[in-house]
């Protein structure tokens, strides 16, 4: 059952469940809403690297920190098309692209729409992560055929000031609402391991589950500490705590894809299998996610074979504009 009225205490009660009971409950919810043993596979490209004016304390691309990152200007349409073809070859059915900037500028909008069209021409779903977005920009992206827009809340409203101060929590939610109003599917999740408490994790999931519409994709990132950022020395989140968060996300947002995102490259096969048992049913493929390492395609193929998992197929690979 889809709910949009979760309380913090209800979410915390799920986190407090005995681990085996929680996993059993989450898996039961999962198989009621998705085909068991299917995982959606997405690829991610950085179309503009570095010099971001935001001060997100975890991010290698922030201009506020000296991380030694090589900066790169906006990609060309041909570069995006080539990357999309490669993503399809290694098994992706969704191609996501992200830019290190605060918000989408109108001067770049037409080129971004061309990126979407190039991706769709390869028979892939498209997803963009371009920072804050105005309603009219979202509508233009919808017209170009964009399927998904990613804009994470990162953490709880209460802990947020410890993560970033150049963008408010409400500004993040406003972008999510603009995307939903334009009719684009939302991809929205957060990052674990930034020093937040269990209550913060529960609060973040309550925020997501109480949106007017649940995000169709919920990426759960495991912090990859980057040298030169304020969070470079953060201890890694406990594996069981991470899996618990996956399970609670699955229960609270039963029809959403729960994605293992950043940090998966450092997870053992057993850890990934446990996450999938708890309800994770989407991954990023490719050896790099923006600026952090990811699992190799051959490792993913071996894992899928060991677990008897098959990639799911995209449901919207044709532009809505083409269908009109």
Curated annotation (Swiss-Prot):
It catalyses: (4R,5S)-dethiobiotin + (sulfur carrier)-SH + 2 reduced [2Fe-2S]-[ferredoxin] + 2 S-adenosyl-L-methionine = (sulfur carrier)-H + biotin + 2 5'-deoxyadenosine + 2 L-methionine + 2 oxidized [2Fe-2S]-[ferredoxin]. [2Fe-2S] cluster binds at residues 96, 127, 187, 259. Gene3D superfamilies: Aldolase class I (3.20.20.70). Keywords: 2Fe-2S, 4Fe-4S, Biotin biosynthesis, Iron, Iron-sulfur, Metal-binding, S-adenosyl-L-methionine, Transferase. GO terms for biological process: biotin biosynthetic process. Catalyzes the conversion of dethiobiotin (DTB) to biotin by the insertion of a sulfur atom into dethiobiotin via a radical-based mechanism. This is Biotin synthase. The lineage of its organism: Bacteria, Pseudomonadati, Pseudomonadota, Alphaproteobacteria, Rickettsiales.
